[in-house]
């Protein structure tokens, strides 16, 4: 790939598609799990949506930890699904089995249509309350506001290819912001690269130049939802640009809005909502409510008061649900 990373392609969906064609009565296939259920990843959006809504789907057994199925023979970040389809079945819904550490939780799940189902059945009631809050307030989801990874067209090999166009950024040094910018990008291409701050001429940015003068709240593009590692959420100031190592959740003209959004995005409820969909950029934030107005005059939240308490109350969560959410976040890593 042009950015120095090796492209990866999913192929397992083709086995399911072929099995559908040749199986006379039923098929049972084992393949990576989390992303197809959430219609996330290359080639999986249409496949995942079609499969989860197929009336021939009889059961989905999901193991978040692939080692419970394969031992140390496979390290699959997506977990594993055992998917059973029956040719003659024409009834809505399917049996969903969530298997963790030797225990199973079985539930009947309706075909979700355009919605995504939570991977953990314990999350269904809470996510339904989040959806109700979004619907009742005519809000959108944050996914729609997230800016593309290629926002400033700075590839991860930019520093390697253009060593004369950058210099390391040292905190406190004088920078002429009329002609120069701070640039957050990888020092090397590929997995060995680490995101670091540099100083570069403003003219190295040729796309979306207007965003240099705004504040973005960004996360690591590799861990955007915070599932496996800290998402490194931070505010990038209005003199800066960044490469593909970061993705902007939102951009604001004022620091106040960026700071309010940052506080919102780091609450228990919103961090939990990020975990409800895969952190690949195709599905990031699909269940995160976006209140859109992050100024002090917004009608939903008072940013001068405790946001966690306000969100729990607005979403109408009971004490057990609040305790569950806090436990999910506090035991994440």
Q: Which role does the model predict for each range below?
A:
Residues 1, 11-15, 35, 71, ...:
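Broad hydrophobic/π-residue packing in well-ordered secondary structure
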């Amino acid at each position: 790939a042009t950015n120095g990373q090796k492209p990866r392609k999913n192929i397992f969906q083709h086995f399911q598609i072929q099995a559908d064609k040749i199986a006379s009565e039923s098929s049972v296939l084992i393949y990576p799990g989390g992303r197809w259920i959430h219609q996330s990843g290359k080639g999986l959006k249409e496949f995942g949506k079609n499969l989860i809504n197929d009336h021939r789907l009889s059961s989905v057994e999901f193991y978040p930890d692939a080692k419970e199925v394969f031992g140390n023979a496979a390290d699959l970040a997506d977990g594993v699904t055992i998917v059973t389809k029956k040719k003659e079945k024409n009834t809505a819904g399917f049996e969903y089995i969530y298997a963790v550490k030797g225990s199973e939780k079985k539930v009947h799940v309706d075909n979700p249509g355009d919605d995504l189902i939570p991977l953990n059945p314990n999350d269904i009631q809470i996510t339904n309350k989040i959806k109700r809050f979004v619907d009742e307030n005519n809000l959108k989801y944050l996914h729609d506001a997230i800016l593309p990874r290629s926002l400033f067209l700075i590839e991860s090999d930019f520093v390697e290819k253009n060593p004369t166009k950058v210099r390391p950024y040292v905190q406190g040094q004088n920078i002429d912001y009329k002609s120069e910018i701070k640039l957050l990008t990888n020092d090397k291409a590929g997995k060995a690269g680490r995101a670091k701050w540099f100083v570069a001429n403003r003219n190295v940015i040729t796309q979306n130049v207007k965003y240099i003068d705004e504040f973005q709240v960004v996360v690591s593009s590799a861990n955007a939802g915070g599932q496996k590692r800290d998402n490194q959420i931070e505010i990038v100031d209005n003199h800066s640009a960044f490469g593909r190592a970061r993705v902007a959740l939102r951009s604001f003209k004022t620091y106040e809005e960026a700071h309010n959004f940052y506080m919102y995005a780091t609450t228990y409820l919103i961090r939990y909502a990020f975990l409800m969909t895969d952190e690949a950029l195709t599905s990031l934030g699909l269940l995160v409510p976006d209140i859109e107005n992050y100024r002090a005059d917004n009608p939903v939240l008072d940013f001068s008061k405790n946001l966690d308490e306000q969100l729990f109350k607005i979403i109408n969560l009971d004490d057990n649900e609040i305790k569950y959410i806090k436990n999910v976040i506090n035991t994440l890593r």
